[in-house]
Amino acid sequence: MSPYLAELLGTMILVVLGDGVVGNVVLNQTKGQNSGWIVITAGWAFGVTIAVYAVSSISGAHLNPAVTVAMATIGKFQWASVPGYIAAQVTGGVLGGIIVWMAYLPHWAATSDQAGKLAVFCTGPAIRHTGANLIAEI
């Protein structure tokens, strides 16, 4: 398997397991609805672990463009491979998101909370305060 395919599959696994557990907790009429943040953090931990174990021996398991750029910046990864890795990671993330969306297809209509639906795929502040939110993300 090529390192690019490994990054694509690893990132896809990460997103399917990570976003999948969030969908299970926040979307209506799922078996895990309202099971809480500890289930989400544990699910993400398992997702990262499984994805890293699945592809680390093939690609180094960057699974994130920021990691790839950081590794290249400190000289531990070739800049020539950065665009291919990032393309594979973005593609894997999109495919993972599509799989999660399809897996929970009936639950999207059953959930009226727009913030909850959005939370399946990204984080958002509970209290909107640009300065504080920016600091929290840095």
PLM feature segments, named:
Residues 1-138:
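Membrane-interface helix-loop junctions and terminal tails of multi-pass membrane proteins
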